[in-house]
């Protein structure tokens, strides 16, 4: 996929700035990334020390396993990423970067990369809108592959599949 992503005309990376987080969230992200690195899995809410639990009304239900037990999800470098959805625009809790030294959620560009947007695709508007654009999109490489099949079907197989 390198040729799909890379554009030699670019002299940098766009949409790759991190969002700010309050100190308590940074502590949770640091714990989550360290836990994932050591355990090879993203932590469940029940794995968090009590001092790092969020002050939300549904935490008790989450600790009982009812829902939101995976509220803080690390995108592990050794596994496929989870599906990027538009919820990433609300907070980055489900999209924590795996490197503990970075202690942050994914940038728009990283989320876009996971969705297979080429690096030369520029997202406009406020960052929240950019995350929504990425999360609501059909992955471009998937759309490209489906389009090639549709063309072959409509042309009776006359067009040769591109080697992407």
What are these regions (language model features)?
Residues 1-164:
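C-terminal target-recognition/interaction regions appended to catalytic cores
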């Amino acid at each position: 996929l390198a040729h799909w992503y890379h554009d030699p005309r670019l002299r940098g990376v766009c949409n790759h700035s991190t969002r700010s987080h309050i100190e308590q969230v940074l502590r949770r992200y640091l714990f989550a990334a360290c836990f994932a690195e050591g355990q090879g899995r993203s932590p469940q809410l029940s794995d968090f020390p009590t001092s790092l639990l969020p002050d939300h009304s549904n935490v008790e239900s989450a600790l009982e396993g009812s829902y939101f037990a995976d509220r803080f999800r690390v995108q592990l470098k050794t596994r496929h990423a989870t599906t990027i959805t538009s919820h990433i625009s609300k907070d980055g809790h489900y999209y924590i970067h795996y490197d503990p030294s970075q202690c942050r959620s994914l940038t728009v560009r990283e989320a876009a990369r996971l969705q297979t947007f080429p690096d030369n695709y520029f997202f406009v508007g406020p960052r929240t809108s950019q995350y929504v654009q990425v999360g609501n999109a059909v992955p471009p490489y998937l759309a490209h592959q489906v389009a090639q099949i549709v063309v072959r079907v409509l042309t009776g197989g006359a067009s040769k599949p591109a080697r992407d």
